[in-house]
């Protein structure tokens, strides 16, 4: 009998914790959240003239998908000024793709709480400020919007050093300009208040590398 009562008390506590999760977040936004995966980072290469480029990734986690395949831990492609990438077999690609699982803690001390129905407009504006061109922003939005727009709210924070410190790219020859846009986000049932994040501008010059990706925090 005592054991049964103990189980019932534990179950009740678990239910209360689950019911108050959003209320706690509303009162005080979570600063660090842990993702299940880093979803769809893609890398575009834009040299001024056609050149051979090698890209390697040092990732603090487990890679779950890579396309095209790496050889000896790196991609080796011929990059054209329009962004077309060609491998040794002659196959062409628009970008390099990878996905992985890590225990990185993403920073939500600043960011944005966006109503689900406003997500497309928000992303168009934010990605333009960050420096993605129209094609890159379109591919970003088409990937993420179906997961976000039906939510009542989305908590969004773009990650910079927090992301790049655990997913390090080495590119040879070294680019003149590198932009890495990574969005960590979480669906919410109620809004939260947090300081708005300042989004840095980016200038494309010479050999430019652009990456975008994101992680949904469940």
Question: What kind of region is each of these model predictions?
Answer:
Residues 11-12:
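Repetitive helical segments and hydrophobic/amphipathic motifs
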Residues 1-4:
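Positively charged n-region of N-terminal signal peptides that target proteins for export
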Residues 21-218:
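Protease-labile, long low-complexity intrinsically disordered regions enriched in Pro/Ser/Thr
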Residues 15-18:
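C-terminal motif of bacterial Sec signal peptides marking the signal peptidase cleavage site
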């Amino acid at each position: 009998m005592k054991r049964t009562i103990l189980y019932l008390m534990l179950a009740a506590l678990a239910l209360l914790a689950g019911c108050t999760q959003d209320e706690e977040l509303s009162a005080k936004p979570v600063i660090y959240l842990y993702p299940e995966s880093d979803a769809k980072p893609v890398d575009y290469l834009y040299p001024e003239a056609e050149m051979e480029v090698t890209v390697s990734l040092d990732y603090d986690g487990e890679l779950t998908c890579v396309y095209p395949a790496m050889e000896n831990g790196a991609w080796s492609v011929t990059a054209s000024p329009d962004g077309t990438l060609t491998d040794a077999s002659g196959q062409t690609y628009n970008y390099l793709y990878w996905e992985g699982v890590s225990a990185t803690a993403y920073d939500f001390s600043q960011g944005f709480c966006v109503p689900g129905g406003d997500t497309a407009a928000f992303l168009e504006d934010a990605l333009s400020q960050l420096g993605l061109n129209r094609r890159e922003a379109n591919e970003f939005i088409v990937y993420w919007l179906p997961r976000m727009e039906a939510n009542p709210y989305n908590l969004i924070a773009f990650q910079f050093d927090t992301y790049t410190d655990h997913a390090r790219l080495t590119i040879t020859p070294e680019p003149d300009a590198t932009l890495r846009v990574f969005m960590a986000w979480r669906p919410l049932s109620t809004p939260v208040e947090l300081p708005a994040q300042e989004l840095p501008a980016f200038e494309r010059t010479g050999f430019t590398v652009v990456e975008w990706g994101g992680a949904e925090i469940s």
